[in-house]
Amino acid sequence: MSKGLLLLWLVTELWWLYLTPAASEDTIIGFLGQPVTLPCHYLSWSQSRNSMCWGKGSCPNSKCNAELLRTDGTRIISRKSTKYTLLGKVQFGEVSLTISNTNRGDSGVYCCRIEVPGWFNDVKKNVRLELRRATTTKKPTTTTRPTTTPYVTTTTPELLPTTVMTTSVLPTTTPPQTLATTAFSTAVTTCPSTTPGSFSQETTKGSAFTTESETLPASNHSQRSMMTISTDIAVLRPTGSNPGILPSTSQLTTQKTTLTTSESLQKTTKSHQINSRQTILIIACCVGFVLMVLLFLAFLLRGKVTGANCLQRHKRPDNTEDSDSVLNDMSHGRDDEDGIFTL
């Protein structure tokens, strides 16, 4: 009787374990319209023995409810839609499910079931997915107001180079001087007109000035004057409240003379600087050469003096021996004389 009760109790316990799925549950929060990955890993994965499936809803007693995806241990063999995929390496047990382009219907509970051979050995994992709206942050807008600058129109910009060309030819020859002065006087009388209707008259007069200037003979002096005039155009432009009034010939000549004098002063200063540098270099070279010669002579004199001293030192002991021999001879001679006197 006791054995029957024991067997009945074991059967009921096994049936209860079979009916109650032992599955863990995680919660994943995602955002609508963005991909979401539901984690699932199995460390003891075997390519030949294990397989797995993903389903919608909690894990049942066997297989997966509303199966979304299934693998055979190495690769995906079936899937419900292309939005469900496994980005990990299936052969190493990385079977996390990735859902792309999520919507509200994708929220809920998902089951990851890893099938292991044997009774009650399947690994079950429930993952709850909660989808929310992505928070949108407004970018700060910066408004920049355009700055308006007043534009002042001048009515006589084209007469300036023509009048300057007539004055530049003055120092070349004597006959064209009369033409240039007359043309300049007429230009001065017509410059103050600032109405738009006077453009035609001014342009015709400007063309007349250019034709008169073309009749003048071209030479090297005229070309040089043209080069200087291009730098003086900025000086001749009208400034102040009366933009139409041109400067007089005396002002032009004074400006040209000041420019030429300033250029000549700059050239002279540059030439003086160059000459001073050259003279300094020449003097330094000469001084260095003289010092080298003096050092060479001193070295030679020192060698001669040392040689003479050495010779004198070598000759001194010979002189002493000679002097000793002479003194001995003199002493012997005196002894002989004393002996003769004694005899």
Curated annotation (Swiss-Prot):
* Topological domain spans for side Extracellular: 23-279
Q: What is its main location?
A: membrane
**Induction context:** Down-regulated in lymphotoxin deficient mice.
Q: Which SUPFAM superfamilies match?
A: Immunoglobulin (SSF48726)
Q: Which residues carry this modification: Phosphoserine?
A: 323, 325, 331
| Membrane topology annotation | Single-pass type I membrane protein
Cited Gene3D superfamilies: Immunoglobulins
Q: Quick check: keyword Transmembrane helix in the entry? A: yes
Task: Return the GO cellular component terms, semicolon-separated.
Answer: membrane
Tell me the Gene Ontology biological-process terms attached to this UniProt entry: apoptotic cell clearance
Subcellular localization is given as: Membrane
Tissue specificity: Predominantly expressed in lymphoid tissues, such as spleen, lymph nodes, and Peyer patches. Also expressed in fetal liver, salivary gland, and spleen stromal cells, predominantly in the marginal zone and to a lesser extent throughout the white pulp. Not expressed in bone marrow-derived cells. Expressed mainly by antigen presenting cells (APCs) in T- and B-cell areas, but not by T- or B-lymphocytes.
Q: Which UniProt keywords apply?
A: Disulfide bond, Glycoprotein, Immunoglobulin domain, Membrane, Phosphoprotein, Signal, Transmembrane, Transmembrane helix
Lineage: superkingdom:
Eukaryota
Q: Does the keyword Transmembrane helix apply?
A: yes
Q: What happens when the gene is disrupted?
A: Deletion mice maintained on methionine and choline-deficient diet exhibit significantly more obvious inflammation and severe lipid accumulation.
| Residues carrying a glycan | 220
**Which residues does the annotated region (Disordered) include?**
239-258, 313-343
Q: Which residues lie on this side of the membrane: Cytoplasmic?
A: 301-343
Q: Where is the signal peptide?
A: 1-22
- Residue ranges occupied by any Ig-like V-type domain in the UniProt entry: 23-128
Q: How does it assemble?
A: Homodimer.
What more does the record tell us?
Belongs to the T-cell and airway phenotype regulator (Tapr) locus, a single chromosomal region that confers reduced T-helper type 2 responsiveness and protects against airway hyperactivity (AHR), the hallmark of human asthma. Low expression of Timd4 is associated with lymphotoxin deficiency.
Q: Which family does it belong to?
A: Belongs to the immunoglobulin superfamily. TIM family.
Protein's recorded name: T-cell immunoglobulin and mucin domain-containing protein 4
Give the classification, highest ranks.
Eukaryota, Metazoa, Chordata, Craniata, Vertebrata
